[in-house]
């Protein structure tokens, strides 16, 4: 469950380390985002010579949440930390690698690229 001001890990090699949610997209007063939702983020910490710089604003898709996602069979998939993958304006990943597992809930038309780059799909 991601809301405004939430700090997330960057799960890709775009150059960002930490990003902060500044808006949950999809609806005028939408409060929370879960796995697979698109959010606006500001880069709070970045590595030197990365593709992104501190202070820049990007779209991102949430790939892991500590709250978890409930499956139709009743099971819940949770993670230790919240993480997101940075996207460009065409909603394609900025990085070329994804770090850590992602959930099967990303298997939409939009995020098959992230699924194929991820080392593990839960």
Curated annotation (Swiss-Prot):
CDD domains: Ribosomal_uL14
GO CC terms: cytosolic large ribosomal subunit
GO molecular function terms listed in the Swiss-Prot or TrEMBL record: large ribosomal subunit rRNA binding; structural constituent of ribosome
Keyword terms, alphabetized: Ribonucleoprotein, Ribosomal protein, RNA-binding, rRNA-binding
SUPFAM superfamilies (alphabetical): Ribosomal protein L14
InterPro entries: Ribosomal_uL14, Ribosomal_uL14_bac-type, Ribosomal_uL14_CS, Ribosomal_uL14_sf
Pfam families registered for this protein in UniProt: Ribosomal_L14
Gene Ontology BP, a term: translation
Task of the protein: Binds to 23S rRNA. Forms part of two intersubunit bridges in the 70S ribosome.
Subunit structure: Part of the 50S ribosomal subunit. Forms a cluster with proteins L3 and L19. In the 70S ribosome, L14 and L19 interact and together make contacts with the 16S rRNA in bridges B5 and B8.
Family, similarity comment: Belongs to the universal ribosomal protein uL14 family.
Protein name: Large ribosomal subunit protein uL14
Gene: rplN
